[in-house]
Structure formats: C-alpha cells, structure tokens
From Swiss-Prot:
Catalyzes the deamination of dCTP to dUTP. Belongs to the dCTP deaminase family. This is dCTP deaminase. GO terms for molecular function: dCTP deaminase activity; nucleotide binding. Homotrimer. One of its GO terms (biological process) is dUTP biosynthetic process. DCTP binds at residues 107-112, 152, 166, 176. Keywords: Hydrolase, Nucleotide metabolism, Nucleotide-binding. The lineage of its organism: Bacteria, Pseudomonadati, Campylobacterota, Epsilonproteobacteria, Campylobacterales. Its EC number is 3.5.4.13. The keyword Cell inner membrane does not apply.
C-alpha cells in the first residue's frame, strides 16, 4: 500500500504493460530527464502539440470547445507563446491497475523556467495516452522539447479496491490516443 517504488513500477510495466514504451532507467544526459526514478516515472512529451491562439477571437468554453482556439504543430521543439498554453500527449501509453491512482507533477527543469505542467490524476482502470496541459507563465516565448521528459508520475496503491474504476464507468477519456480536447458527455 502507499507510494510505489522503482522496483514495483518496473515489475508492473514488464508483467502488466502498465507503461508502454517503458524506459528502464533514468535517462538524463543532454535531455530533460525521463524514465523510471526512485518513486516515480518521468514521462515524455510527444512531438504533436495544440497551441492556443487568439486568431479565431472566440472564448474558451470547456462545455463547447471550439477547435479554432488551437493550431496544430508537429516538431522536435514547440515554442509556446508568452502567457499562452499548449496541449500535448505522452509518448507512453498507460494501463492503470484497478487499485492504483497516479498523480502527475511538473518537472522542476521546466518549472524553474516559468513553464507549468498540469495533468489530472490517472484513475484506477484508466487506459490511454495522457493529454498534457502546458502553461507558459512568462512574458517570453518558451521551448518544449519533444521526446524528452515533461512531468513525473507517482503511483499510489489503495488500501482497498475502489467500487467503480474509470473503465467501469466508461470514462469519457478512456483509451484516448493523441491529444484529446475537452469533452462533455451529453
């Protein structure tokens, strides 16, 4: 029970495909680090981004999201405009065990540059790529490096099984691939 170690993360990734692809060790020379760490896993950001723009002149509405609010970008380095926002996805695909919740926190390398990463919890039973929210809080353009680390995931095992997993309730982001924009079930 509690926070899970590198040995547990490695075992679950090999035996249950919890993280695919899985980086066995922390990779950190010349890149923003990624891979397994002592009590977590540093995820990588893919090379596709949706960057928020004011071209459409619309209001951001989570209940009725207008795709004109974002522009698509693919490349090794994404420039997030000053005081702006981008969406991306992990390279890794997650298969969360039914008794484990994961919490994701931004990496200090980016945080020290004014780049804040937000990811909501990975619920028990969730499967899919993770959509990553990236905020540039600075008055300057900011670089995000594709295929490198972006955030750290901590795995917490529950002391008893939950009654309903994300898979059981057919969560609206279950099995998401690519970058998923906001959804409201109707």
């Amino acid at each position: 029970m509690g926070l899970k170690s590198d040995a547990w993360i490695r075992k679950m990734s090999h035996e249950k495909a919890m993280i695919v692809p899985f980086a066995e060790e922390q990779v950190g020379r010349g890149v923003v680090s990624y891979g397994v760490s002592s009590y977590g896993y540093d995820i990588r950001v893919g090379d596709e981004f949706k960057i928020f723009t004011n071209i459409g002149g619309t209001v951001v509405d989570p209940k009725n999201f207008d795709e004109k609010n974002v522009v698509d970008f693919k490349g090794d380095v994404c420039i997030v405009p000053p005081n702006s926002f981008a969406l991306a996805r992990t390279i890794e695909y997650f298969n969360m065990p039914d008794n484990v919740l994961a919490i994701c926190l931004g990496k200090s390398t980016y945080a020290r540059c004014g780049i804040i990463v937000n990811v909501t919890p990975f619920e028990p039973g969730f499967k899919g790529h993770i959509t990553i929210e990236i905020s540039n809080t600075t008055p300057l353009p900011a670089k995000i490096y594709a295929n490198e680390g972006i955030a750290q995931v901590l795995f917490i095992e529950g002391d008893e099984p939950c009654e309903v997993t994300y898979a059981d309730k057919k969560g609206k982001y279950q099995a998401q691939e690519g970058i998923t924009l906001p959804r409201i079930l109707k």
